[in-house]
Amino acid sequence: MSLSDKDKAAVKGLWAKISPKADDIGAEALGRMLTVYPQTKTYFAHWADLSPGSGPVKKHGKVIMGAVGDAVSKIDDLVGGLAALSELHAFKLRVDPANFKILAHNVIVVIGMLYPGDFPPEVHMSVDKFFQNLALALSEKYR
């Protein structure tokens, strides 16, 4: 699903508003994913504490949202811009690509909770399309 110029503008505009709280969004989204989708915990079994708000969850939430911010800056070429990250997840971490969509869903939920006034249906749709394209780009090396 391609992103229109309007979609790209909506994603960039929302990112400008939420990026100061990106670390908190990432930690909350990851904590929710690990709770609501416990099968995702298998990728983080080496962490001592997988509970929401724990140090490792906060730290990785920051990493995740840093990658999302990077993706926003590479919105015109997600496949090329995220090739190294796709390779890491496919060959080293061996993450099932279905989990990218699960995490994206949780990020969208948290954005909607924290920024309801900045997240009308039109922006939600653009952000959802962006995350679909992001998940597809991260899945590129699995083929």
Swiss-Prot record:
What molecular functions are annotated in GO for this chain? haptoglobin binding; heme binding; iron ion binding; organic acid binding; oxygen binding; oxygen carrier activity; peroxidase activity
Modified sites of kind N-acetylserine:
2
Specify the Globin domain's residue ranges.
Answer: 2-143
Tissue-wise expression: Red blood cells.
Q: Give the matching InterPro entries.
A: Globin (IPR000971), Globin-like_sf (IPR009050), Globin/Proto (IPR012292), Hemoglobin_a-typ (IPR002338), Hemoglobin_oxygen_transport (IPR050056), Hemoglobin_pi (IPR002339)
Q: Can you cite a GO biological process for this protein?
A: hydrogen peroxide catabolic process
Q: Where does O2 bind?
A: 60
- Keywords of this entry: Acetylation, Heme, Iron, Metal-binding, Oxygen transport, Transport
Query: Do the record's keywords include Metal-binding?
Result: yes
Q: Name one GO cellular component term.
A: hemoglobin complex
Disulfide-bond pairs as recorded? none
Q: Does the keyword section mention Heme?
A: yes
Q: Where does heme b bind?
A: 89
Tell me the superkingdom of the source.
Answer: Eukaryota
- What function is annotated for this protein? Involved in oxygen transport from gills to the various peripheral tissues.
Quaternary form? Heterotetramer of two alpha chains and two beta chains.
Q: State the family named in the UniProt similarity comment for this chain.
A: Belongs to the globin family.
Q: What name does this protein carry? A: Hemoglobin subunit alpha
| Source organism per UniProt | Cyprinus carpio
Q: Which gene codes for it?
A: hba
